[in-house]
């Protein structure tokens, strides 16, 4: 043994492998107000003790590696390490458990979702000692929240810009999502906005393809928007998708939209990436553009119950990164979404302060301090018969978005938009009169259809359409 090795060994270094729990499992630790807290659903390999598995997660997502290293002695280890401080059993689960981990705030770069996720959901998710790992929730402390701009504008500013109050907003995704020319696409936008919708939308995979380049689409959609505005005397918007192959190209598209004078642009925040999304959110605030966020790719990450990242975490990350709208599921439509869980992360998007509530999947009390709220967007397989339930579930601060439920009506696009607007106005009026939308919803729609032939036609088409499948992701 060399003299240097003997000296280092004498002050505590010992090469080899030791159990993570000896360093990273600290059940007596009281989390600090400034710590970032994480709740992980951990499925260890057979025979693996929960304390060791939870400590391994804390180690591999903070300062640890598989063996002690010399340079551990050159840092203030207790200050920077993550700590597995509590373990909960999962009700009804044979093997998984919830491990709570506290991370010191100094581990994270200010204002960077990318850096936060590189640590907390980095290599640890491929760790062989774990069969599966899922990040269920994060507590973002105010000290870290205040380093982010957050949404470009927020709910109240959007309502003021649009001059629309007291009801949910209505939208429509233009279909077919791929294949239309820019001029025909703009025609569909005009017909939907003229029929009474507040917004139309590019689908998530509409970027700049050979059949419709982005600049042509932006121009025809802006023309349609302004024509519909002049005829309805209502402020309208179209979510022009600025998502691109590079950040520079994305910003160029947003600049062009701003020069056209349109009120809103769109971004696919998961496929585009958090760094690009935050850059676009900053541009939108500086230039008065609203920012609609699509969550394309989310189900790859969040749908499996035991592995991945729950959408409530992705929703919190979006509120930090920036967006004025985000798709949130519908509860009643064609896409995955259990009611209590969905309402839990809808509150996390909109409210200033959300209390811990395990019945809705909220593991931590979350204060948002001054960060603006985000409007949830209900979209996917919904139609006029769903309007009472959607109005009751999501309330006024929401966007209810009907693609096929507008463009698939028998009389055409504009009558489809009329049907949705009439159904919404009827539900809002009934709610304001004290009627129970959950119990009387179908009757409310039938009564409104008596004086709206457009709604009557839509009701006839969709009367037997339901998506009755159990949610995969449950509490």
Swiss-Prot record:
Binds 1 Mg(2+) ion per subunit. The record marks 334 as: Transition state stabilizer. It is an enzyme of class 4 (lyase). The disulfide bond which can form in the large chain dimeric partners within the hexadecamer appears to be associated with oxidative stress and protein turnover. InterPro entries: RuBisCO, RuBisCo_large_chain_AS, RuBisCO_lsu_C, RuBisCO_lsu_C_sf, RuBisCO_lsu_fd_N, RuBisCO_lsu_N_sf, RuBisCO_lsuI. Pfam families: RuBisCO_large (PF00016), RuBisCO_large_N (PF02788). One of its GO terms (biological process) is photorespiration. GO terms for cellular component: chloroplast. It catalyses: 2 (2R)-3-phosphoglycerate + 2 H(+) = D-ribulose 1,5-bisphosphate + CO2 + H2O; D-ribulose 1,5-bisphosphate + O2 = 2-phosphoglycolate + (2R)-3-phosphoglycerate + 2 H(+). The keyword Magnesium applies. The modification N6-carboxylysine is found at residue 201. The active site is at 175 (proton acceptor), 294 (proton acceptor). GO terms for molecular function: magnesium ion binding; monooxygenase activity; ribulose-bisphosphate carboxylase activity. Residues 1-2 form a propeptide. The keyword Lyase applies. Substrate binds at residues 123, 173, 177, 295, 327, 379. The modification N-acetylproline is found at residue 3. Its cofactor is Mg(2+). Its EC number is 4.1.1.39. Belongs to the RuBisCO large chain family. Type I subfamily. Heterohexadecamer of 8 large chains and 8 small chains; disulfide-linked. The disulfide link is formed within the large subunit homodimers. The basic functional RuBisCO is composed of a large chain homodimer in a 'head-to-tail' conformation. In form I RuBisCO this homodimer is arranged in a barrel-like tetramer with the small subunits forming a tetrameric 'cap' on each end of the 'barrel'. This is Ribulose bisphosphate carboxylase large chain. It comes from Plumbago auriculata. The gene is rbcL.
């Amino acid at each position: 043994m060399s003299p240097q090795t003997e000296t280092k060994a004498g002050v505590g270094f010992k090469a080899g492998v030791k159990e993570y729990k000896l360093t990273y499992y600290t059940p007596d630790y009281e989390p600090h107000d400034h710590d970032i807290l994480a709740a992980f659903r951990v499925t260890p390999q057979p025979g693996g003790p929960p304390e060791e598995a939870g400590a391994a997660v804390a180690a591999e997502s903070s300062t640890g590696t598989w063996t002690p290293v010399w340079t551990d002695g050159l840092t203030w280890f207790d200050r920077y390490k993550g700590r597995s401080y509590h373990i909960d059993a999962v009700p009804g689960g044979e093997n998984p458990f919830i491990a709570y981990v506290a991370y010191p705030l100094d581990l994270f770069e200010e204002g960077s979702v990318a850096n936060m996720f590189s640590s907390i959901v980095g290599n640890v998710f491929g760790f062989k000692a774990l069969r599966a790992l899922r990040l269920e929730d994060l507590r973002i402390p105010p000290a870290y929240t205040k380093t982010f701009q957050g949404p470009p504008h927020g709910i109240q500013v959007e309502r003021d810009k649009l001059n629309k109050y007291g009801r949910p907003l209505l939208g429509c995704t233009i279909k077919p999502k791929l294949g239309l020319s820019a001029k025909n696409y703009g025609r569909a936008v005009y017909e939907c906005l003229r029929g009474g919708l507040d917004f139309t939308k590019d689908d998530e995979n509409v970027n700049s393809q050979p059949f419709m380049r982005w600049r042509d689409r932006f121009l025809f959609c802006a023309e349609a928007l302004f024509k519909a505005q002049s005829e309805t005397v209502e402020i309208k918007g179209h979510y022009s998708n600025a998502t691109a192959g590079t950040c520079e190209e994305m910003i160029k598209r947003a600049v062009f939209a701003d020069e056209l004078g349109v009120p809103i642009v769109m971004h696919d925040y998961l496929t585009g990436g958090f760094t690009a999304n935050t850059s676009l959110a900053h541009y939108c605030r500086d230039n008065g553009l609203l920012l609609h966020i699509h969550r394309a790719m989310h189900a790859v990450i969040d749908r499996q119950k035991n592995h991945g990242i729950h959408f409530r975490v992705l929703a919190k990350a979006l509120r930090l990164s920036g967006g004025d709208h985000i798709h949130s599921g519908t509860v009643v439509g064609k896409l995955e979404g259990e009611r209590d869980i969905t309402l839990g992360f809808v509150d996390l998007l909109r409210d200033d302060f959300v209390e811990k509530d395990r019945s809705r999947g909220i593991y931590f009390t979350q204060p948002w301090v001054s960060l603006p709220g985000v409007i949830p967007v209900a979209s996917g397989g919904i139609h006029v018969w769903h309007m009472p339930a959607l109005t009751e579930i999501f309330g006024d601060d929401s966007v209810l978005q009907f693609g096929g439920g507008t463009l698939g009506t028998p009389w055409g696009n504009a009558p489809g938009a009329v049907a949705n607007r009439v159904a919404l106005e009827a539900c809002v009026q009934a709610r304001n009169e004290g009627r129970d939308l959950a119990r009387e919803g179908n009757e409310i729609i039938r009564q409104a259809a008596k004086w709206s032939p457009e709604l009557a036609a839509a009701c006839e088409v969709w009367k037997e359409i339901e998506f009755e499948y159990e949610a995969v992701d449950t509490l």
